Design a protein with these regions (language model features):
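Conserved "landmark" site that anchors the functional core of diverse proteins
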Residues: 1-345
C-alpha cells in the first residue's frame, strides 16, 4: 500500500462521496459532494466508480505528497493552478505521483470546489453506506471532520495505467433553474416575481449546510413559520428576515420556514460552484422539464467513460468551438489549394 499525505490544506475541505442515502428518516442528512459531476469526472479518470469517496477541496489551496510508493490521482471541478515538481497539471486529467512527489493546488480561479480522486478510492468505515463527512454531526470516515495537515490515506499503489483526460460538455450558463414550491403559495405573485426577477449573490458566510442569498427581502403572505416538513438539496427557504437560504448537502432533514422554490437536481452543482459575490438569477421551469434534465444528467454520468481520452492526445472541444463559431472559421476561411483566406469569420 502507498500513502497520500495531506501536506497542507485550506478550510472547507473534507472526504465526500455520493452521499448517505436511506437515513434521512433518522435525521441524518445526505451530505456528499457539492458538485456531483466533478466528483464523477475525477473518479472516472482513475477508474473508480463515479461517486466513490474523494477529497473535496474548498476554495483555498492544498498540497498532497505520495509516500511509500507511487499514487495515481485526478482532479476536476473549480479550475485552479496545479503542478507536480513545477510541471503544470491540467484540470480534468490524471497524474501519477512518484514516491516523494507533491501535487500542489492553488486557489480556485472560479467556482469553489475541486475534487481529488485517488485510484482505488479512499477507504474507511462506512456510516449508513457512505464515507461522506458531515462535520457538524461528526459523521464520516476516515476523518469525520474537515481535513488538516498531517492527515493521510492508505491507498492502492499506482497501477501504471497511462494518464487520461476527460472531455466534459460545455458548462451550462444562464439562470439557475428552479421549480416553484412546495410552499410558493405562502408568497404573493409580486414577491414570487421579485424572487425570479432579481439578481442574487451568495454571501461569504455560506457553507455546506446552506447558501445565504443576498438581494431584496422577500415578504411572506401569512408569516414565516410553517409546520416543519422535509427538505431536499436545493430547497430555498425564506426565514423571517426575508433573505432566502438555499439548503445544500449538509442541510437539516426538516425545516419550519416556507420554501419558495427548489433548485432542480441538475443545477444544484452549478449553484454550489457559484463563487461568493457573483451575481446570478433564477428561472422557473416545469416539473416535467426538471425531470427531463435529471434524466439527461444521469445519462451524462453513465457515459463519462466514453469521454476519456489519452492525456497525450490534443484536446479539441468541438462543442465549444462550434458554439464560438471557431470551427466554422477553420473549415471555411481557407482555400484548400492555396491556403488563402476565402471567407470572413
Amino acid at each position: 500500500m502507498s500513502r497520500l499525505v495531506v501536506a497542507s490544506i485550506g478550510p472547507a475541505s473534507s472526504v465526500q462521496d455520493g452521499g448517505r442515502h436511506g437515513a434521512q428518516r433518522y435525521g441524518l442528512t445526505v451530505s456528499g459532494a457539492m458538485d456531483r459531476l466533478s466528483l464523477a469526472a475525477a473518479n472516472t479518470l482513475v477508474g473508480n466508480e463515479p461517486f466513490a469517496a474523494s477529497v473535496e477541496i474548498g476554495p483555498f489551496g492544498a498540497t498532497f505528497t505520495a509516500r511509500d510508493g507511487a499514487v495515481r490521482v485526478a482532479i476536476s471541478g473549480a479550475p485552479r493552478n496545479a503542478d507536480v515538481a513545477g510541471n503544470p497539471v491540467a484540470m480534468d486529467t490524471s497524474v501519477t505521483l512518484k514516491d516523494g512527489e507533491t501535487l500542489t493546488l492553488g486557489f480556485a480561479r472560479g467556482g469553489a470546489f475541486t475534487y481529488l480522486a485517488i485510484e482505488g478510492a479512499i477507504k474507511g468505515e462506512m456510516v449508513f453506506g457512505s464515507l461522506a463527512v458531515n462535520a457538524r454531526a461528526g459523521l464520516g470516515s476516515p476523518y469525520p471532520r474537515p481535513l488538516q495537515a498531517g492527515d493521510e490515506f492508505s491507498v492502492d499503489a499506482a497501477s501504471g495505467a497511462g494518464e487520461l483526460r476527460i472531455e466534459l460538455p460545455k458548462p451550462i450558463s444562464g439562470p439557475i433553474r428552479v421549480v416553484l414550491g412546495p410552499q410558493d403559495d405562502e408568497f404573493d405573485d409580486a414577491n414570487k416575481a421579485l424572487f425570479l426577477g432579481s439578481e442574487w449573490k451568495i454571501s461569504a458566510t455560506s457553507d455546506r449546510m446552506g447558501y445565504r442569498l443576498e438581494g431584496p427581502a422577500i415578504k411572506h403572505l401569512h408569516g414565516h413559520n410553517i409546520v416543519s416538513d422535509g427538505t431536499v438539496n436545493g430547497s430555498i427557504q425564506v426565514p423571517g428576515n426575508g433573505s432566502p437560504i438555499a439548503l445544500m448537502m449538509d442541510r437539516g432533514t426538516s425545516g419550519g420556514y416556507p420554501k419558495i422554490a427548489t433548485v432542480i437536481t441538475a443545477d444544484v452543482g452549478r449553484l454550489a460552484q457559484t463563487s461568493a459575490g457573483t451575481a446570478f438569477r433564477f428561472r422557473a421551469v416545469s416539473m416535467a422539464e426538471a425531470q427531463d434534465e435529471v434524466r439527461k444528467f444521469a445519462q451524462l454520468i453513465r457515459n463519462l467513460p466514453d469521454r476519456l481520452r489519452s492525456a497525450d492526445s490534443v484536446a479539441l472541444n468541438i462543442e465549444a468551438l462550434s458554439d464560438a463559431n471557431v470551427a466554422g472559421y477553420a473549415v471555411s476561411a481557407m482555400d484548400a489549394g492555396t491556403w488563402q483566406v476565402t471567407a470572413e469569420p
